[in-house]
């Protein structure tokens, strides 16, 4: 399963910003084989979740130093709560699991109870509460045996909350600042921010899991779609560096190029983005020779970057000319003619150099005449 991104070139335009992405809908941006469908996935048996690692004998042995707790009674209460869960009385089961999590603190019962409480909230489509409960469990029980399931749930929640961005032809990077008092499947405020928090949680708590790179890719693409290109560049770069074997590598390279281009602010500002873009384009062409349909776009963008680097030298030379430092201007003119001799900026620089040569005798005469 791969994410498909089509990059097209705007006909007749060779500027740095001409190559724009035509991104797919949210359905194509999801590893669907790992994610339960929303809004109402089938409930997963609590017994199945527990059977992977639960042993009553080991359970009691681990916590026999807590004489104040009747762990056997806790286990029996948990099984009763599971029975209610299987009967799909999720609200009643949620209350039971909540009570167990408060009574059996710092025991495996607490871990399982918090997880099952979150499952009840998820299956009743109260996703903000479910997110909070999943996060509580992950914070306290790092490396939980429920981690894989929790990651899939968190990803599903994020995908649901961000679907308006990924399906829109003109996505907005914000939700209306109106509190949500009626839809319990969405948070009170900051819908997109909560979705990004869930994606971040996946990467922090399960960095080597099957959804870590998917979460990072969705985060990067979200920022790209809402035109926050510096943030998008940061996340695409993180994906390229942290997940070299990810199926999203080629797309992260292509959209990384676009993010860097859009982040460039012009010759008056730092030109580091141009250098990084040039390196990334070369890396993309070298690592992904099969991207033949994008090669022409990459080559044209590379040429545009080269022209912009030449323009930066020309603008710098002009700055020194205007500020009364002709010798410094000449240094940049010479550098421009040597590095980019086939550009119009080099031709302009050469004209300036020729003019400066004509002025040398005049300047010398003025110098000696000052002593007469």
Feature locations, PLM:
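Bacterial N-terminal signal peptides
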Residues: 1-12
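Acidic, polar-rich low-complexity tracts and alpha-helical solenoid repeat scaffolds
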Residues: 13-372
């Amino acid at each position: 399963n791969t994410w498909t991104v089509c990059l097209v070139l705007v006909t007749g335009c060779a500027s740095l910003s001409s190559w724009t992405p035509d991104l797919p809908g949210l359905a194509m941006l999801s590893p669907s084989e790992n994610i339960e469908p929303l809004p109402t996935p089938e409930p997963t048996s609590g017994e199945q979740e527990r059977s992977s690692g639960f042993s009553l004998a080991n359970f009691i042995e681990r916590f026999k130093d807590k004489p104040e707790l009747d762990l056997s009674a806790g286990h029996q209460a948990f099984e009763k709560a599971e029975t209610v869960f299987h009967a799909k009385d999720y609200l009643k089961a949620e209350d039971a699991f909540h009570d167990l999590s408060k009574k059996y603190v710092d025991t495996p019962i607490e871990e399982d109870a918090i997880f099952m409480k979150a499952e009840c909230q998820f299956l009743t489509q109260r996703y903000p509460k479910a997110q909070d409960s999943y996060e509580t469990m992950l914070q306290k029980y790092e490396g939980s045996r429920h981690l894989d399931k929790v990651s899939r749930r968190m990803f599903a929640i994020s995908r649901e909350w961000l679907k308006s961005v990924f399906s829109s032809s003109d996505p907005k990077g914000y939700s209306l600042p109106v509190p949500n008092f009626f839809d319990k499947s969405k948070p009170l405020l900051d819908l997109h921010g909560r979705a990004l928090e869930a994606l971040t949680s996946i990467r922090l708590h399960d960095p080597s899991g099957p959804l870590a790179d998917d979460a990072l890719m969705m985060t990067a693409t979200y920022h790209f779609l809402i035109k926050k290109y510096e943030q998008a560049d940061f996340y695409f770069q993180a994906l390229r560096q942290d997940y070299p074997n990810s199926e999203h590598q080629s797309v992260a390279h292509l959209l990384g190029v676009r993010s860097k281009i859009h982040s460039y602010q012009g010759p008056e500002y730092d030109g580091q983005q141009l250098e990084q873009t040039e390196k990334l384009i070369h890396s993309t062409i070298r690592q992904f020779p099969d991207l033949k349909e994008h090669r022409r776009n990459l080559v044209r963008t590379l040429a545009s970057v080269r022209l912009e680097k030449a323009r930066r030298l020309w603008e710098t030379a002009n700055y020194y000319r205007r500020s009364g430092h002709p010798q410094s201007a000449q240094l940049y003119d010479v550098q421009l003619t040597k590095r980019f001799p086939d550009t119009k900026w080099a031709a302009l620089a050469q004209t300036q150099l020729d003019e400066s040569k004509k002025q040398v005798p005049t300047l010398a005469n003025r110098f000696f005449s000052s002593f007469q």
